[in-house]
Amino acid sequence: YVYQAMRVTGAADPTVSVKETLKGKLPQKKLVRGAAHGYSSYGNQIGLATGLVKEIYHPDYVAKRMEIGAVLGAAPRRAVIRENSDPGDIIVLLGGRTGRDGCGGATGSSKVHTEESIETCGAEVQKGNPPTERKIQRLFRREEVSKLIKKCNDFGAGGVSVAIGELADGLRVDLDKVPKKYAGLDGTEIA
């Protein structure tokens, strides 16, 4: 089960005057406070304690901040099985529905951002679903559930194709059957 989280961030000096903010960038104070609030709010909704918070202040983060988050989990050895996948195994997608948000996130975090990029890159930030994630955490605490799972993977920034593709050497996935947040998305957009 997931039992705690950690957060490591890098920002420039948040006490610097707003007048010294780089053109096209938000003030460091706003970034630092907003990120801390967002992380805290999300963790509270999921029900996780954040055991480690480390904020690094350095001038090299003035143009692009660093934000790293992780959750830690544990399970009794007897509740975890590791088996190879077999033909006919069922793949279950568990969690929130898939949307355009988050698509391209793996590469988007490394892009050069400008005043105009907010129009095209905002969708690369995945919009989570804390209540659903909390239910999944509670489900995985049940040993009778965890013993049914041969392999498990999170979607991460790679999306459906990467997450499922890492489970077996060869498989077919009908991307049009993936539960979606809204109508109009086709398989090629979420792959």
Where do the language-model regions lie?
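Glycine/proline-enriched, intrinsically flexible loops and inter-domain linkers
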Residues: 1-191
